[in-house]
A protein has these predicted regions:
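Short, contiguous strand/loop micro-motifs
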Residues: 24-26, 119-121, 216-217
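Active-site-adjacent bridging/hinge elements
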Residues: 10-16, 102-113, 197, 201, ...
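Conserved protein-kinase catalytic-loop position immediately C-terminal to the HRD catalytic Asp
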Residues: 246
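Short secondary-structure boundary micro-motifs
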Residues: 2-3, 9-10, 16-19, 79-82, ...
């Protein structure tokens, strides 16, 4: 369909007004198209030629509103670096509504009521990074938000230097976060907490909506999806950088691409966020932080679900859900055709060898994929080839 035929739904606005605030975007000056994503456009039945339509830039810039668009920003709280922040929300994200189950949201469209002294803008480099990385993650088979397009402008913003502002259009099956539940738990609005849970089930786990035990099963599936997601992150060397509970998706998606990075030399202690001085969100800590975040999520759900039942599910995360998910994806990465009891030991020894070898993570697997018995190509890419030799 063409841009003028888009018809947005805003089911989230059926919730109480404390869940959101209506927001008016602030258009950029002299906005222009940087990139349009025809692959993401197919998800909402938008014609691939829409990137050539000037109204696409206007859509992202907030000056063109198709049928049903009602801009709003979502309210949530969250634990940031382990400390509870009682009111966060979409500081620079503006939701337009949903099409075909995909919620469209602009990032960088101006100040919202949650901006917290920021300008509500996004710089061109960081916007392009998110646009490219979210699409790369999708094509690597990792659950993620998508990006429909990105625009630049002549609007100047102050970061470390003066930069030009951009807006990226993000798409997600859900923008509900762990921190959304925390907000209503800590403000003791348990009726709204229940309404949010019902909404999240219909949105992301519709097969549970008529189940008598739907709240516990909802929590269980969030734990399972999160375990699989983090295992996939670890398998490709993805480091998120800001794993606060407000950046954790209840749908098991990679969301909020900020100071993310990919591993170069394999290093469990790698930290991609310069503000993370203690290494809380280092590459090697991501599985543990996910468990901690799920524990905070379980606390937020405790008015609805027995805490002991949730704790047993959390114990499963550490004992077999995450370890098994990680072994499964690494088994595929190594091209192992059969599941053997020895696989876990083989993979554990491999990552230990990579840590000791000072070797580029991605390059190691590219080289290993061409392994024909000749070891020198693998030795040549390691600063400490003895570690690779001992594993082989």
């Amino acid at each position: 369909m063409t841009l003028d035929k888009l018809d947005f739904q805003t089911d989230y606005l059926s919730l109480d007004s404390e869940f959101y605030d209506m927001t008016e975007p602030t258009p950029l000056d002299d906005a222009y198209l940087i990139s349009f994503n025809p692959h993401a456009a197919k998800l909402i039945d938008l014609e691939s030629s829409s990137g050539d339509d000037p109204r696409f830039v206007d859509l992202l810039n907030g000056t063109f509103r198709p049928e049903g668009v009602r801009p709003f920003s979502m309210c949530y709280a969250g634990h940031q670096f382990g400390h509870y922040a009682p009111r966060l929300g979409d500081g620079r994200a503006i939701n337009l509504g949903s099409i075909n189950g995909w919620h469209l949201q602009t990032k960088g469209g101006g100040e919202t009521l949650y901006a917290r002294m920021s300008d509500g803008r996004a710089a061109i480099p960081s916007s392009i990074r998110e646009y490219l990385m979210s699409e790369a993650m999708h094509h690597l088979g990792i659950p993620t938000t998508r990006a429909l397009g990105v625009i630049g402008s002549q609007t100047k913003i102050l970061r470390n230097d003066i930069e030009k502002a951009a807006i990226v259009m993000r798409m997600s099956p859900s923008w509900v976060r762990f921190g959304t539940f925390e907000y209503f738990y800590y403000t003791k609005q348990h009726d709204k907490l229940e309404a949010l849970t019902d909404y999240a089930i219909v949105e992301s786990y519709p097969h549970l909506k008529d189940d008598e035990d739907r709240y516990f099963k909802f929590f269980s599936e969030v734990v399972e999806r999160t375990a699989k997601l983090i295992a996939q992150w670890q398998s490709i060397g993805f480091c998120h950088g800001v794993m606060n509970t407000d950046n954790m998706s209840i749908a098991g998606l990679t969301i909020d691409y900020g100071p993310f990075s990919m591993l170069d030399d394999f290093d469990f202690g790698f930290v991609c966020n310069k503000t993370d001085k203690a290494g809380r969100y280092s590459y090697g800590e991501q599985p543990n932080i996910s468990y901690w975040n799920l524990t905070m999520f379980s606390k937020a759900l405790s008015p609805l679900i027995d805490q002991n039942r949730m704790q047993k599910k959390l114990d499963d995360y550490g004992s077999f859900l995450y370890p098994n998910a990680y072994i499964d994806v690494m088994r595929k990465k190594l091209g192992l055709e059969m599941k053997l009891d020895e696989d876990a030991e083989l993979i554990t020894e491999l990552v230990g060898a990579l840590q000791d070898a000072y070797v580029d993570y991605t390059n190691f697997f590219r080289t290993l994929s061409r392994y024909d018995g000749e070891r020198m190509p693998l030795y040549d890419i390691a600063m400490n080839p003895v570690a690779i030799h001992n594993w082989l």
